[in-house]
From Swiss-Prot:
Protein source organism: Vibrio parahaemolyticus serotype O3:K6 (strain RIMD 2210633)
The enzyme's E.C. designation: 2.8.1.7
InterPro entries: Aminotrans_V_dom, Aminotrans_V_PyrdxlP_BS, Cys_deSase_IscS, Cysteine_dSase, PyrdxlP-dep_Trfase, PyrdxlP-dep_Trfase_major, PyrdxlP-dep_Trfase_small
Binding site for pyridoxal 5'-phosphate: 75-76, 155, 183, 203-205, 243
Phylogenetic placement of the source organism: Bacteria, Pseudomonadati, Pseudomonadota, Gammaproteobacteria, Vibrionales
Family listed: Belongs to the class-V pyridoxal-phosphate-dependent aminotransferase family. NifS/IscS subfamily.
CC per GO annotation: L-cysteine desulfurase complex
Protein name: Cysteine desulfurase IscS
Name of the gene encoding the protein in the UniProt record: iscS
Length: 404
């Protein structure tokens, strides 16, 4: 068993060895290194063929047409292209956008940018289990609403939104619907023929592919139009200029092919590990699972251990690679904005830790993690006067603290 144990799959995954092996064949002189846009010689044709194959593999995972897949540098760029691209293109129809307070920063920040440009954005409050109330979404829709952006699976708490139902509402009102599926692609079935979703952001490195490559699904029927955010040689049907990174695209394609093939196996494996970890720590008293436990991907377990500072717990678990919040915000000491949006008080939000597992996590690693967590939580609580008061039955919310 290799230490530290990696339990932060929601931040990034190791590249599957099968993917790495394939990528290496597209970089050097003895491989297929050409520019896929070079139309005048075999080096270019072979690279273009490799890109076409990857496009099909990615489309297959969504049951989409390969022509609906646009390559980008990752889900952040896809989110930006989808949100700003759609809002700008349809701005003559209206300037109102709807999203949710628990979205990833790559969705919230483009929305903030739109606000600076004069758009109006409604940020929905999720319920305390992290899920969106469809009635509230319906009530927020207006005649000038041009875009709804709701993530499929939340990166911090792993809850699954009802994308199919939201899609129905949007299609009824002829509103463009964007979904950030960075955390769900390869983990849950996504079928664009069944779901009325117009734009889907995808990332390779959350699906055992390389970092720095992603894609945006752009529906053709009914046709969705976007304003390009990256201008240049007109690659990717004008949606996204820039030479295609063949080796990364091949890696993403292979990763998505494997994910489709092994989805059920990966799901069952993660579920067994999730339940094992939860059963191993839930009797520690004052343990809360954040987010709905049923409507959730099995790869994620976000837990608050009351009276234990999340940061101190991370420090104590030096042999476990885990996180509090998302990797993008883990440098700030602010409590997680996602947990706050669930109506959680700062203390409990501060005491949360996210464990996320994947294809290469073993039962042995989970058992070791359980042991480490139990020791650390017990030790930290022994040091806490608040824990003593709680054990004595003092209601801490009624305590008046003296200011010095």
């Amino acid at each position: 068993m290799k230490l530290p144990i990696y339990l932060d799959y929601s931040a990034t995954c190791p590249v599957d060895p099968r993917v790495a092996e394939k990528m290496v064949q597209y970089m050097t002189m003895d491989g297929t290194f050409g520019n896929p846009a070079s139309r005048s010689h075999r080096y270019g044709w072979q690279a273009e063929e490799a890109v076409d194959t990857a496009r099909e593999q990615i489309a297959d995972l969504l049951n989409a047409d390969p022509r609906e897949i646009v390559f980008t540098s990752g889900a952040t760029e896809s989110d930006n292209l989808a949100i700003k691209g759609a809002a700008h293109f349809y701005s003559k129809k209206g300037k109102h956008v709807i999203t949710c307070k628990t979205e990833h920063k790559a969705v919230l920040d483009p929305c903030r940018q739109l606000e600076r440009e004069g758009f109006e954005v409604t940020y929905l409050e999720p319920e305390s289990n992290g899920l969106i109330d469809l009635e509230k979404l319906k009530a927020a829709m207006r005649d000038d609403t041009v875009l709804v952006s709701i993530m499929h699976v939340n990166n911090e708490i792993g809850v699954i939104q009802d994308i199919a139902a939201i899609g129905e509402l949007c299609r009824e009102r002829k509103i463009v619907f964007h979904v950030d599926a960075a955390q769900s692609a390869g983990k849950l079935p996504i079928d664009v023929q069944e779901m009325k979703v117009d734009l889907i952001s995808l990332s390779a490195h959350k699906v055992y592919g390389p970092k720095g490559i992603g894609a945006l699904y752009v529906r053709r029927k009914p046709r969705i139009r976007l304003e390009a955010q990256m201008h240049g040689g007109g690659h990717e049907r004008g949606f996204r200029s820039g030479t295609l990174a063949t080796h990364q695209i091949v890696g993403m394609g292979e990763a998505f092919r494997i994910a489709k093939e092994e989805m059920q196996k990966d799901y069952d494996h993660a579920l067994a590990l999730r339940n094992r970890l939860l059963n191993g720590v839930k009797d520690l008293e004052a343990v809360t699972v954040n987010g709905d436990l049923e409507q959730r991907v099995p790869q994620n377990l976000n837990i608050s251990f009351a009276f234990v500072e999340g940061e101190s717990l991370l420090m104590s678990l030096k042999d476990l690679a885990v996180s509090s919040g998302s990797a993008c915000t883990s440098a700030s000491l602010e409590p997680s904005y996602v947990l706050r949006a669930l109506g959680m008080d700062d203390e409990l939000a501060h005491s949360s830790v996210r464990f996320s597992f994947g294809r290469f996590t073993t039962e042995e690693e989970i058992d070791y993690a359980i042991e480490q967590i139990r020791v650390a939580v017990t030790k930290l609580r022994d040091m806490s006067p608040l824990w003593d008061m709680y054990k004595e039955g003092v209601d801490l919310s009624t305590v008046e603290w003296a200011h010095h």
